[in-house]
Amino acid sequence: MNNLTKVLSSDFKFEDAIKVFGEKFPLTAKEFYSLQEEYKNKAFTVANYSNVKIIDEFQRVLLKAIEGGKTMQDFRSEMNSFLEDHGYKGLTNYRADVIFRTNIQTAYNVGHYKSMTSPAVKKLRPYWKYVAVDDGHTRPTHRAMNGKVFPADHSIWNTWYPPNGFRCRCQVVTLSKRQVEERGLKLEEEIPKVVEFQGVPFRLLPDRHFQTNPAKGLDAQVDISSLPDVLQRAYLRKTEKSKK
């Protein structure tokens, strides 16, 4: 069973993930990509739409899918009805899948991170292992991380926490000290800056725009006045909309 299936079929508690996704600020892609990496987990966007009202509808329909366990085809059907009613072309199956999968996976991993970092869990299972799907579709950098084990509080998880790219299928699992020892797993301290795949060197980084942990810093109280102007404007738009 892959991560996406787990999201839609398990009894995993998504209250935190739902709350976090619902509180994201809808932005145009231009606004979103102008943000520093540390602020992107507070925002939501979909490329190729300059009307924030369209992006707001994407967020609403995705949130409904996360809350209700809707399928990608449910999402695509509802969004295409809206888009076509507003003079836009409908989403192709591939594009709908990219948008749906990325956001569902992010919601799952935010919820999973909160579970893994609870004091009780960290005490019993203080190590985390990166797991990539090792097949012909796996990116070289993601494959290079496959099976690596680090302490749960290692800084690597500030960067290498999935999703680490569009259509990323990676996950992070927790391990007890006993499991690490019995399986003979190597406990990593550092990772190489460059890896080689089929004779080609790659910088060992997640994909562009996926180089921060989507769950980091979301519990902290945020002073809206300290946010970049584009997020402050989005906050005001969202506040005004909620009053209607």
Question: What kind of feature is each model-predicted range?
Answer:
Residues 1-165, 173-244:
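Domain-core detector
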